[in-house]
A protein has these predicted regions:
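Residue-level signal for beta-strand positions within conserved beta-sheet cores that form or flank
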Residues: 69, 82, 121, 134, ...
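Proline-centered turn/helix-capping motifs that create local helix->coil transitions or kinks
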Residues: 29-31, 77-78, 166-167
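A short beta-strand motif characteristic of beta-propeller blades
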Residues: 1-3, 84-87, 134-139, 183-184
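Hydrophobic beta-strand positions in blades of beta-propellers and related beta-sheet-rich domains
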Residues: 1, 73-75, 123-127, 135, ...
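Conserved beta-propeller blade repeats
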Residues: 6-24, 50, 60-65, 73, ...
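Predominantly five- to eight-bladed beta-propeller fold
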Residues: 26-74, 109, 119-124
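Short loop/turn segments that connect beta-strands within beta-propeller blades
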Residues: 77-81, 129-133, 178-182
Length: 184
């Protein structure tokens, strides 16, 4: 193993120069309770502590309570070592990761809206700059944009998605655009 992780990594992606591996991983993040509870008296036999819920999607059918945390993006040296966390937001950053040919940017799909739970299929393609951890949207469409892939010359991005018309089924299309999000 090139590193020891506390959670399972997914969406592995080698940098074009071969020096780094990017991946996403669930990262737990506990939130403090809004009130402090009294301490347990000596000898008391209490049940487990109450769960503090502050989000709409806190429980899954058959899966119990959702863990606090989100899928975050990491990068680490391909030779091994400690991963460096690149995202730390209240959004899931899972899905395919695509490197720019110069290994300076990673493109990914995510729903980073405040109302993401109410608009689950409204994702965009984002560019993450490794040196600054700056994230900028490349697409801004109504519907899911996913699976970004940068062209070998670094000029274009291919991705899949559709314009959401709120139908029960919509087929995804293949799109190609300039690296800055123009000319879709």
């Amino acid at each position: 193993a090139v590193t020891q992780l506390t959670q399972a990594p997914s969406n592995l992606s080698w940098s074009p120069d071969g020096s780094q591996i990017a991946f996403s991983m669930f990262t737990p993040k506990s939130k403090p309770a809004p009130v402090s509870l009294p301490g347990k008296p000596e000898g008391a036999n209490w049940t487990e502590a109450p769960k503090y819920v502050d989000k709409d999607n806190y429980r899954f059918d058959g899966g119990g309570y959702a863990k606090d945390g989100h899928q975050q993006i990491y990068v680490m040296p391909a030779t091994g070592g400690s991963p460096r966390q690149l995202t730390d937001d209240e959004f899931n950053h899972g899905g395919q990761l695509a490197w720019s040919p110069d290994s300076k940017h990673i493109f990914f799909s995510a729903n980073r809206r405040d109302d993401a739970f109410r608009q689950p299929v409204n994702s965009e393609i984002y560019r993450l700059t490794l040196s600054s951890k700056e994230i900028s949207a490349v697409t801004d469409r109504n519907g899911p944009d996913s699976s970004p892939k940068v062209s070998p010359d670094g000029e274009k991005i291919a991705f899949t998605g559709y314009d959401d018309t709120k139908m029960s089924f919509q087929a995804s299309n293949l799109y190609v655009m300039d690296l800055d999000g123009s000319d879709v």
